[in-house]
């Protein structure tokens, strides 16, 4: 990777040619981009994308990938003609009970900052890798909480008009692991709007949000629905995530992943009843708008894909991509995986679950240049 010296064209943003993208993603898979533009401020992001979009209209540019933390991406190794724009604008400010974070801020830093200011509401989202700007796109959630619970508005760049404006959270059409941003992005490359900044309204009482998730309540030894100290909740969440290999650790290949690869499917009540009647023992399920939410990890394991699948023969080579040995929903890079390895394993698991249960799992990460 070498600097191209073209930063002046992008308001001083850093520009590098022949830039490997794999080290910039949590899965550590991806191509060498033709050009990587790293924007350290929102002004650089705006100037860079306006220029690239002008070039696009003139038919003079490569496909453009906009990303930050790289925690929810599977990028095809074949996409070598990319111009990648990395958001590194990372400011975090607190005013009263409002927390504002620029898109490139490390998400867990946002959570910790809120807690250090005595604000509750984000603590269940501790330890989730990635950037603040990505959280509303997926409506990131964990342990009974979602970003949409506390998000008040986002500042976005409309790439069609070039205008920048604040959009209320009520206009973002949030759903389970989705939003208007995700629904409008055809392939993850031609995204019509880019998040520049997010704002959250949090609880200044010194208490957490109500603990809604049974596993977390058990870890805290409190009843479901009770509030607790946000810092204590954060510590419990981090402990739970670490036991599942869901806290990034460069030395642990179980954490080289995009987190849960499949979303928990929501099925019609009669589908759940048929499933419950066809297996021994209880089927984990939860009420959900429009049906019943099933546990994707349970479906994966019951379909024959246990933790660590495929397990290598004694003394034999390890597959380049395996399920985590700690969590059945995490597809992990064991050190040499390429995008084709990840997609092949994901396809095997999806097809296996569909064959056994008649339920099709949907991938949670953004797939760029590849599909199941």
Curated annotation (Swiss-Prot):
> Could you list the residue ranges that cross the membrane?
none
State the pathway, as annotated in the record. Answer: Cell wall biogenesis; peptidoglycan biosynthesis
Q: Where in the cell is it found?
A: Cytoplasm
Query: What EC number(s) has UniProt assigned to this enzyme?
Result: 1.3.1.98
Provide the alphabetized UniProt keywords.
Cell cycle, Cell division, Cell shape, Cell wall biogenesis/degradation, Cytoplasm, FAD, Flavoprotein, NADP, Oxidoreductase, Peptidoglycan synthesis
Is Cell cycle included in the keywords of this UniProt record?
yes
Gene Ontology molecular function, alphabetical: FAD binding; UDP-N-acetylmuramate dehydrogenase activity
Cofactors: FAD
Report one GO cellular component.
cytosol
| Domain of life, source organism | Bacteria
Q: What class does this enzyme belong to in the EC scheme?
A: oxidoreductase
Could you tell me which residue ranges the FAD-binding PCMH-type domain spans? Answer: 29-205
Q: Per the UniProt entry, what is one GO biological process? A: peptidoglycan biosynthetic process
- Any Pfam family from its record, for instance, is FAD_binding_4
Catalyzed chemical reaction(s): UDP-N-acetyl-alpha-D-muramate + NADP(+) = UDP-N-acetyl-3-O-(1-carboxyvinyl)-alpha-D-glucosamine + NADPH + H(+)
Q: Where is the active site?
A: 177, 260, 364
What the entry lists under PANTHER family is as follows: UDP-N-ACETYLENOLPYRUVOYLGLUCOSAMINE REDUCTASE
Its function, per the record, reads: Cell wall formation.
Which protein family is it in? Belongs to the MurB family.
Name the UniProt record assigns to this protein: UDP-N-acetylenolpyruvoylglucosamine reductase
């Amino acid at each position: 990777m070498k600097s191209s010296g073209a930063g002046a064209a992008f308001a001083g943003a850093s520009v590098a040619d022949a830039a490997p993208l794999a080290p910039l993603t949590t899965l550590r898979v991806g191509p060498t981009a033709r050009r990587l533009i790293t924007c350290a401020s929102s002004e650089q992001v705006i100037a860079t994308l306006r220029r690239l979009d002008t070039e696009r209209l003139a038919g003079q540019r490569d496909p453009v990938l906009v990303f930050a933390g790289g925690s929810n991406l599977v990028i095809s190794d074949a996409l070598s003609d990319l111009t990648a724009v990395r958001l590194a604008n990372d400011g975090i400010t607190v005013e009263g009970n409002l927390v504002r974070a620029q898109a490139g801020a490390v998400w867990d830093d946002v959570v910790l900052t809120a807690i250090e200011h005595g604000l509750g509401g984000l603590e269940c989202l501790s330890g989730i890798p990635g950037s603040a700007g990505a959280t509303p796109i997926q409506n990131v959630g964990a342990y009974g909480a979602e970003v949409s619970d506390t998000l008040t508005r986002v500042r976005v760049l409309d790439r069609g008009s070039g205008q920048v404006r604040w959009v209320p959270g009520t206009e973002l059409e949030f759903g389970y692991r989705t939003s208007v941003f995700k629904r409008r992005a055809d392939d993850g490359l031609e995204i019509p709007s880019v998040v520049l900044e997010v704002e959250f309204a949090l609880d200044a009482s010194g208490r957490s949000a109500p603990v809604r998730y049974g596993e977390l309540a058990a870890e805290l030894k409190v009843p479901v629905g009770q509030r607790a100290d946000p810092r204590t909740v954060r510590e419990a969440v981090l402990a739970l995530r670490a036991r599942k290999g869901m806290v990034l650790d460069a030395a642990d290949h179980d954490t080289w992943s995009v987190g849960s690869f499949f979303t928990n499917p929501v099925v019609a009540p009669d589908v759940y009843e048929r499933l419950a009647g066809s297996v021994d023992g209880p089927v984990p399920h939860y009420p959900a708008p429009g049906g019943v939410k099933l546990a994707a990890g349970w479906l994966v394991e019951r379909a024959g894909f246990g933790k660590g699948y495929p397990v290598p023969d004694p003394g034999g080579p390890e597959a380049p991509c395996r399920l985590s040995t700690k969590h059945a929903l995490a597809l992990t890079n064991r050190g040499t995986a390429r995008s084709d390895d990840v997609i092949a394993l994901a396809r095997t698991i999806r097809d296996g679950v569909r064959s056994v249960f008649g339920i099709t799992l949907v991938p949670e990460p953004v797939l760029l240049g590849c599909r199941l």
